[in-house]
């Protein structure tokens, strides 16, 4: 477990104390990425909910996912190395809530989105992410550098007569080559 993740788990467990919860389930992309120092729980950025979630109890932390996602989360995201125990369920079963309940016991469970009979605590979780850690600041600097480099590479490849959609495609390609997700890219030409 990294010092960054340790600090974040302390924040979450402090929230458990303040809210009288025994566990919290993080399903949103942003919260999953925050709690894992950048791991991706999603297949598509078109949804706010990922293919895996994190359950944090007072003394353990788990990743809950279907059996298809588990190998990727282990090999690519290295979540077990970060201190998360991966618990799976068959891909064809909707067992996320039941598995969370099994792992957390009979106590109160919060969730960052309305889900099952868990208490919705998304509004209380978001402020935990507002102050950046030194590691996050460094990652943002690196992301800024990588984004600038992608924009420069794409801009250098633009030729007179290129369609706006072709320019967007070039930039998208440069971003994706570096594993950078984007929400929107615009291009304008005269």
Question: Predicted segment positions?
Answer:
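Internal metal/ion-chelating core segments
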Residues: 133-190
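A composition/biophysics-driven feature that prefers long, compositionally simple stretches
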Residues: 1-152, 164-165
């Amino acid at each position: 477990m990294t010092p960054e993740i340790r600090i974040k788990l302390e924040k979450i467990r402090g929230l458990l104390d303040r809210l009288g919860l025994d566990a919290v389930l993080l399903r949103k992309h942003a919260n999953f990425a925050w709690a894992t120092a950048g791991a991706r729980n999603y297949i598509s950025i078109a949804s706010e909910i990922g293919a895996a979630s994190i359950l944090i109890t007072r003394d353990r932390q788990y990743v809950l996912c279907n059996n298809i996602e588990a190998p990727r989360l282990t090999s690519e995201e290295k979540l077990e190395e970060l201190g998360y125990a991966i618990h799976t369920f068959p891909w064809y079963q909707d067992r996320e809530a039941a598995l969370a309940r099994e792992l957390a016991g009979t106590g109160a469970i919060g969730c960052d989105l309305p889900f099952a009979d868990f208490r919705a605590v998304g509004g209380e979780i978001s402020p935990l992410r507002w102050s950046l850690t030194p590691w996050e600041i460094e990652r943002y600097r690196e992301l800024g550098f990588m984004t600038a480099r992608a924009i420069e590479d794409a801009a250098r490849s633009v030729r007179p007569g290129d369609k706006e959609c072709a320019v967007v495609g070039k930039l998208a390609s440069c971003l994706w080559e570096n594993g950078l997700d984007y929400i929107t890219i615009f291009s304008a030409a005269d």
